[in-house]
Curated annotation (Swiss-Prot):
Protein name: Endoribonuclease YbeY
Primary localisation category: cytoplasm
Gene Ontology cellular-component annotations: cytoplasm
Gene Ontology molecular-function annotations: metalloendopeptidase activity; RNA endonuclease activity; zinc ion binding
Keyword Zinc: yes
Domain of life of the native organism: Bacteria
GO biological process, one term: rRNA processing
Cofactor: Zn(2+)
Family: Belongs to the endoribonuclease YbeY family.
Gene3D superfamilies with a match to the protein in the record: Metalloproteases ('zincins'), catalytic domain
Keywords: Cytoplasm, Endonuclease, Hydrolase, Metal-binding, Nuclease, Ribosome biogenesis, rRNA processing, Zinc
Length: 169
């Protein structure tokens, strides 16, 4: 089973059901991977999502990635990707897959630039972050293409258009 714990700062209160959105995004992302069975596993896998401000994400980005600026999403995996397959053997029946942290200001700005609702862009970022928790990355071009393909599939199941499509104005 999967549990998605959402903590949203007050500036995220815009009428969106962030908990529902996060659960749907995490589930959609997981279903696109070989780890989909985790959704129905006997153990409880938890993903923690924090919706916060640019200042907090800036500080975390500086501390953990040595990048002195805010970013849209940070992911902090708690399970090494090569150990995910063995989670069925978890002693206590629970495992924290990791944390996903979104920056409100960056998310709102990027959504406006893309001409999409903030909730739609945040969904994409949560899908992206979930894939990072499952061991996917985009350092190399082939990894980036594979990860983007998974994102497209997950988002399509949620009725969200390809975020990487180039549109002509």
């Amino acid at each position: 089973m999967i549990e998605v714990a959402v903590q949203a700062e007050p500036d995220w209160a815009d009428g969106t059901d962030w908990e529902r959105l996060a659960i749907e995004a995490v589930t959609a992302a997981m279903r696109t991977t070989p780890h989909a069975a985790m959704l129905d596993a006997a153990y409880m896998a938890e993903v923690s999502i924090r919706l916060t401000d640019d200042d907090e994400v800036h500080a975390l980005n500086r501390q953990y990635r040595q990048k002195d600026k805010p970013t849209n999403v940070l992911s902090f995996p708690m399970v090494q990707d090569d150990l995910i397959e063995g989670l069925d053997n978890s002693d206590d029946g629970e495992v924290l897959l990791g944390d996903i942290i979104l920056a409100r200001g960056v998310c709102v700005r990027e959504a406006a630039e893309k001409g999409v609702p903030t909730a739609e862009h945040a969904t994409h970022l949560i899908v992206h972050g979930t894939l990072h928790l499952l061991g996917y990355d985009h350092i190399e071009d082939d990894e980036a293409e594979a990860m983007e393909d998974l994102e497209r599939v997950a988002l399509a199941t949620l009725g969200i258009d390809d975020p990487y499509a180039i549109t002509e104005d």
